[in-house]
Design a protein with these regions (language model features):
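An N-terminal hydrophobic leader/cap segment in hydrolases
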Residues: 14-71
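Conserved alpha/beta-hydrolase
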Residues: 100, 107-129
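Short alpha-helix in the alpha/beta-hydrolase fold that links the catalytic acid
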Residues: 106, 236, 250-257
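Alpha/beta-hydrolase active-site loop
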Residues: 132-150, 155
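Gly/Ala-rich beta-loop-alpha elbow adjacent to hydrolase catalytic centers
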Residues: 158-167
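Short beta-strand/loop motif that positions the catalytic acidic residue
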Residues: 233-235, 240-242, 246
Length: 347
């Protein structure tokens, strides 16, 4: 991947400058590939497959400090993971150049709805090991998490950008019935990636050979595993959230795809772009509501009600205690266990 998944195309007054830059880049990489292919590959990997550093905010660091931490191993790279809350989990999958904590706006609303949240830093990102990464490693990270000790708890995924691509690949490969919310997903990933290489001027023969090396290393195929080609095999429900002004991943891709598949729903936003969409409260609420509220939350309300009744029981006089005892038969045993010396009931 590049530092940007999609670049602005050559147009207007910049077209001649753009084409000139492409020719210079093509000449440079062709010469380097002919005379020092190993060096050429290293340069391309460093330029296009090495993510930039994501700087966490104080709020994000506080979330990380208060999470339960665990690790998984992806192709001999340690991947750092965090969990908040209890109950069934929703996995938060970040995109290229991001971090799991980038989706922190979803954590507390998920907990309020009875879910726990699990986030991770993909290989080469954040606190995880590695200097480079790829779509295939993103996919294997999610697949590994779903088969980890925490995997049986995962009920759905909220994924951003390349994380959405990897989520689609995972659901198809594992034949999972997971619900997924894909935010600004790169579903035509091959076209986006190839388009970027063409835009900057990397010769096609060179980047296709490099991608082939990644395919052989990780056991995937860029054409076969292009997310748009996998969607026809997926029957679980998917919600796509995409902004019309996204400068990175074209909104029209999500619109066209959602029109083709009955199990895919599209929620459109405006003026949020590619990243601000992750912090928008209406987007967060739409995503949480898509999974539905867990019964555990209702049980929690009942528990709070029970606690209030118990408190009233402790403070009440003899008549009030007797009435509470008779009105709440399901709580009698609990009342008696609280304070045997004060328990009041029919003799």
């Amino acid at each position: 991947m590049s530092t940007r998944l999609l670049a602005v195309g050559c147009n207007g007054t910049n077209v001649r400058l753009c084409k000139m830059r492409q020719r210079v880049t093509q000449t440079f990489f062709n010469f380097l590939w002919d005379h020092a292919p190993t060096v050429s590959k290293k340069i391309i990997k460093r330029l296009f497959f090495a993510p930039t550093t994501y700087k966490s905010t104080p709020v994000e660091r506080e979330y990380l400090d208060n999470a339960k931490k665990f690790e998984v191993s992806i192709h001999d790279k340690t991947v750092k993971c965090w969990k908040w809350g209890s109950g069934p989990s929703i996995l938060l999958a970040h995109g290229w150049n991001g971090r799991g904590i980038q989706l922190h706006h979803f954590i507390e609303p998920l907990r309020q709805s009875g879910y726990s949240a699990i986030a991770y830093d993909a290989p080469g990102h954040g606190e995880s090991q590695g200097r480079t990464s790829s779509y295939f490693e993103f996919t294997d990270t999610i697949r590994t998490l779903l088969t980890s000790p925490y995997g049986h708890e995962i009920r759905g995924v909220i994924a951003h950008s390349l994380g959405g691509s990897a989520t689609v690949n995972t659901i198809e490969k594992e034949n999972l019935p997971l619900k997924a919310v894909l935010i600004a997903p790169a579903l035509r990933l091959k076209e986006v990636l190839y388009g970027f290489f063409d835009y900057v001027g990397v010769p096609r023969t060179i980047y296709e050979l490099l991608i082939k090396e990644y395919e052989d290393q990780f056991g995937y195929n860029m054409h076969r595993d292009n997310p748009v080609n996998l969607l026809r095999e997926i029957h679980s429900k998917i919600l796509i959230i995409h902004d019309t002004n996204d400068p990175t991943i074209p909104y029209v891709d999500s619109k066209g795809i959602s029109d083709r598949f009955p199990n895919i729903e599209l929620h459109t936003t405006e003026r949020l772009g590619h990243k601000k969409v992750l912090a928008d409260s209406s987007v967060v609420n739409r995503a949480i509501n898509y999974f539905g509220e867990q019964p555990r939350k209702k049980e929690g309300k009942e528990m709070s009600k029970s606690i209030n009744i118990l408190e009233e029981y402790r403070k009440g006089d003899l008549d009030r205690r007797l009435n509470l005892f008779l009105e709440c038969p399901s709580l009698r045993a609990e009342f008696l266990e609280i304070d045997q010396s004060e328990a009041v009931g029919p003799s």
